[in-house]
C-alpha cells in the first residue's frame, strides 16, 4: 500500500519516494513523501500473536502532540544525525479494519472497524503499555494488542472515527473528574483546539452553561456549531485577562497550561476546579514572543489557590470506560468534532500544512487511505 511519511533524502533513494514535498513548520523544513509498505506477516498459529490483531489503517489524523514528534524527526534528518531514520511515520488517531486476529481474541472479528483505546493510567494487561496506542498511524499497517482498540458503530463515518479517540477519551475523563453540578458556570480556553471542541460539545449535550474563550474570529457556521455556548474573543498574546469582563467560573478547562493557567486562577469561584491536559510549547521552536509563560506570578497563583480552596487538576487521556462512554453518546446528527478537510496520500504537504499552520482551521484534517 501507499503510505505517507517524513522522508530522509540522505538515506532513502529517490526512486523509493513518490510525491516528495517540503513544508515549513515553525522554522523547521519537513520533507514528506509517499512510500510503499507491504502487508506484515501475521501467523495466527504463533502463540505470540494470540492476543493481537492486524489492522489496515483506513484513515488517520494528527493531534497537537504529534507536532513535536514530526519536528524532532525532521530536525534529526536535516542535521544528518546518526540516529536519524530513512523514514518517520506519524499520527496518533486512526480508524482501521481488522484483517487478522490471534487465537485468543474473541470480541474482535475480521472486518470490524476499530479506533485506538489509549487507556491511562491503569494497566489492563501485564506487559501492555498504557497511553497512546501509536505514533505511526500513517504507516498504514498496525499490529496491536486486543485491549488497545475498540469497535465502533456503523453510523460513525471513517472521517469522524479517524479524529475521535484521543479527543473523546481525554474530554470524557476531564468532565468526569470535575464533578460538575447543573448550576456550575464553565469556561473552556483555546476553544478552537480539538480537545476543547470535544469538551464544549460534550458539555452542551448535557445542558451546561459554557463560555468559550478564543483568539480567532469565528464564522457564523462555526458559532452555530457550538451554540448556545458564549464565544468571547481576546487578543492573541494578551498578558492579563483583568482588562476583559469575563466574570467568575466554577470550572475551567484548559488544554494549554503554559499559556493560560496564570490567568485562569483569578477567574475561579470558591471551591472552583481548574483542569488541564497539556501544554503548547512542547518543542523550543514552538515558543512565540507573545506567549505569557512568566514564573514570577507562581507564588500569587498558589496563594489564590489556597485561600479560595481551589482544585488544580492534571489529566492525561482517560480510561477505557471514558472512551466507551464517548462512543455510546456519539450522535451522527450532532458530532463532537468538525472535519475541516479530507485529503488523500498524495497531498501530504497539504495535510501537514492544514493541520499545523492554518490558524483558520476549524476541526480535524483527515488523510484517507481508501481508494
Name the predicted role of every residue range:
Residues 43-61, 74-123:
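Glycine-rich beta-strand-centered segment in the early N-terminal region that forms part
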Residues 84, 92, 117-190:
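NAD(P)H dinucleotide-binding glycine-rich loop of Rossmann-like/cofactor-binding domains
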Residues 115, 252-253:
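N-terminal Rossmann-like NAD(P) cofactor-binding module of classical short-chain dehydrogenase/reductase
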Residues 162-238:
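Mid-domain Rossmann-like dinucleotide-binding core that forms the NAD(H)/NADP(H) cofactor-binding site
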Residues 173, 319-371:
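C-terminal hydrophobic helical "lid"/dimerization subdomain
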Residues 206-208, 259-336, 368-371:
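Glycine-rich phosphate-binding loop and adjacent beta-alpha segment
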Residues 237-247:
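Short amphipathic alpha-helix with an adjacent loop that forms part of the alpha/beta core around
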Amino acid at each position: 500500500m501507499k503510505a505517507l511519511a517524513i522522508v530522509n533524502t540522505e538515506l532513502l533513494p529517490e526512486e523509493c519516494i513518490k510525491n516528495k514535498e517540503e513544508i515549513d513548520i515553525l522554522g523547521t523544513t519537513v520533507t514528506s513523501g509517499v512510500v510503499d509498505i507491504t502487508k506484515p506477516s501475521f501467523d495466527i498459529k504463533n502463540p505470540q500473536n494470540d492476543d493481537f490483531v492486524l489492522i489496515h489503517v483506513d484513515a488517520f489524523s494528527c493531534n497537537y502532540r504529534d507536532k513535536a514528534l514530526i519536528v524532532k524527526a525532521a530536525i534529526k534528518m536535516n542535521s544528518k544525525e546518526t540516529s536519524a531514520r530513512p523514514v518517520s511515520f506519524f499520527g496518533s488517531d486512526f480508524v482501521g479494519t481488522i484483517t487478522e486476529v490471534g487465537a485468543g481474541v474473541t470480541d474482535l472479528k475480521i472486518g470490524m472497524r476499530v479506533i485506538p483505546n489509549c487507556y491511562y493510567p491503569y494497566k489492563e494487561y501485564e506487559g501492555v503499555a498504557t497511553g497512546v496506542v501509536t505514533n505511526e498511524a500513517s504507516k498504514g499497517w498496525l499490529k496491536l494488542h486486543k485491549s488497545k482498540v475498540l469497535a465502533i458503530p456503523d453510523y460513525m463515518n471513517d472521517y469522524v472515527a479517524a479524529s475521535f479517540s484521543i479527543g473523546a477519551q481525554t474530554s470524557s475523563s476531564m468532565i468526569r473528574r470535575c464533578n460538575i453540578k447543573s448550576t456550575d458556570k464553565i469556561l473552556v480556553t483555546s476553544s478552537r483546539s480539538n480537545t476543547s471542541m470535544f469538551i464544549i460539545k460534550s458539555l452542551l449535550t448535557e445542558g451546561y452553561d459554557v463560555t468559550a474563550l478564543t483568539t480567532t474570529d469565528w464564522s457564523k457556521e462555526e458559532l452555530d456549531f457550538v451554540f448556545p455556548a458564549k464565544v468571547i474573543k481576546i487578543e492573541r498574546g494578551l498578558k492579563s485577562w483583568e482588562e476583559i469582563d469575563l466574570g467568575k467560573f466554577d470550572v475551567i478547562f484548559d488544554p494549554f497550561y503554559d499559556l493560560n493557567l496564570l490567568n485562569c486562577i483569578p477567574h475561579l469561584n470558591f471551591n472552583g476546579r481548574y483542569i488541564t491536559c497539556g501544554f503548547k510549547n512542547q518543542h523550543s521552536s514552538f515558543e512565540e514572543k507573545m506567549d505569557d509563560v512568566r514564573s514570577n506570578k507562581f507564588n500569587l497563583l498558589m496563594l489564590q489557590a489556597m485561600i479560595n480552596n481551589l482544585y488544580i487538576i492534571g489529566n492525561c487521556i482517560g480510561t477505557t470506560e471514558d472512551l466507551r462512554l464517548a462512543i455510546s453518546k456519539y450522535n451522527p446528527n450532532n458530532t463532537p468534532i468538525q472535519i475541516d478537510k479530507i485529503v488523500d496520500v498524495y497531498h501530504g504537504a497539504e495535510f501537514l500544512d492544514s493541520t499545523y499552520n492554518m490558524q483558520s482551521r476549524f476541526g480535524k484534517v483527515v488523510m484517507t487511505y481508501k481508494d
